[in-house]
């Protein structure tokens, strides 16, 4: 069995990124702010603004966090998976309501595709397009085959 690294691949760059994310989310996602944002309207039909703050999302984009693992050839930064993990962990600690995790999931799925349309989608993600996945069976249905 291969021994796993004790730091799970976190190098100096990833540690600095994690520290920056921790500070960003502490400064911008206090429990009171998050509660005020999402708890005032429990309806499933509430407007998107009550679910996630688009101006805060734009700051995440400007910090390069949506592009952190996207290859440089597609407009990203090209860091390893642990860079996204560092950001995602801090986002989760603060209960940051956003499409960040779904965007990361889409990013890694698209990276595995390595096609022109996938690379175009990666470039869109790198510039701030919030993204998610829709997975269907071979017939295009959500139901089991």
Model-flagged regions — what are they?
Residues 82, 103, 127-128:
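Short connector loops at helix/strand junctions that flank enzyme active sites
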Residues 36, 97-116:
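N-terminal glycine-rich flavin-associated loop
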Residues 43, 77-78, 104-109, 142-143:
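Short secondary-structure boundary/hinge segments and terminal tails
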Residues 17, 24, 64, 106-112, ...:
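Short alpha-helical scaffold segments that flank and stabilize functional sites
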Residues 1-100:
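Amphipathic, small/basic residue-rich leader segments at the start of a protein or domain
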Residues 76-77, 96, 112-145:
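Glycine-rich, Trp-frequent "lid" loop and neighboring beta-strands that shape
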